[in-house]
From Swiss-Prot:
InterPro entries: V_ATPase_D. This is V-type ATP synthase subunit D. It holds the Pfam family ATP-synt_D. Keywords: ATP synthesis, Hydrogen ion transport, Ion transport, Transport. Gene3D superfamilies: 1.10.287.3240. Belongs to the V-ATPase D subunit family. GO terms for molecular function: ATP binding; proton-transporting ATP synthase activity, rotational mechanism; proton-transporting ATPase activity, rotational mechanism. Transmembrane segments: none annotated. Produces ATP from ADP in the presence of a proton gradient across the membrane. One of its GO terms (biological process) is proton motive force-driven plasma membrane ATP synthesis. It comes from Anaeromyxobacter dehalogenans (strain 2CP-C).
Length: 209
């Protein structure tokens, strides 16, 4: 940081900069508190979502194993091929205290038997159940993915905000306080010297009676 002029205007300038830096640090702390609150809310949602995903995948795997046993892998593979599809995803960005956070949305993924590319009668009950459970798992997965993207972005922004707070509080503000003290001390010393010179001048040049 460059030194300010050792003048009263320089002192006022440094004090004004210190006030702005202090206000900036307070605003950043408020921002971090809001982001942290949002982060902890999301952590709870993500943990809950992962538990739902674990349960959905457990059901899907169990249903698939049963379908393989009852209908055979070859038949299931022949049904899976026409059932394949592209899933359109919509990614939007919202802002929390100016932080862009992505959100992923998809249409409903669980389909009726007649929407899987084959005649409904082609699907046995166990194969249809396995397909449904896997589609349900994908829905849960996409919901969690959106929240985890948001969680990661918030974590990055909290770290960046903390770095900025530390820079202000540990570097900028102490430097400005030190600079203000230096200028104030120099001005005080200058005032004392001026007072001494004035007294000497008056002593040498007394006013006429």
């Amino acid at each position: 940081m460059s030194r300010a002029a050792t003048t009263r205007m320089g002192l006022l300038e440094v004090r004004a900069r210190r006030a702005v830096a202090g206000k900036g640090a307070r605003l950043l702390r408020a921002k971090r508190e809001v982001l942290a609150s949002e982060l902890w809310r999301l952590v709870h949602d993500v943990l809950e979502g992962r538990a739902r995903l674990d349960e959905a995948l457990r059901r899907a795997v169990k249903a698939l194993e049963l379908a393989k046993a009852l209908e055979g892998e070859e038949r299931l593979a022949s049904l899976a091929l026409p059932a394949a599809r592209a899933v359109p995803l919509a990614v939007t960005v919202r802002r929390v205290w100016g932080v862009p956070t992505p959100s992923v949305a998809a249409p409903p993924l669980v389909r009726a038997a007649d929407q899987r590319g084959s005649s409904p009668v082609s699907w046995g009950p166990s194969g249809a159940a396995a397909a449904r459970h896997h589609e349900e798992s994908l829905e849960v997965l996409l919901t969690i993915a959106s929240k985890e993207l948001h969680l990661a972005r918030l974590g990055e922004e909290i770290q960046e905000t903390s770095r900025r707070i530390n820079a202000l509080e540990q570097l900028v503000l102490p430097a400005l306080r030190s600079e203000a003290s230096r200028i104030a001390a120099a001005l005080d010393e200058r005032d004392r010297e001026d007072a001494v010179r004035l007294r000497r001048f008056r002593a040498r040049h007394p006013r006429p009676a």
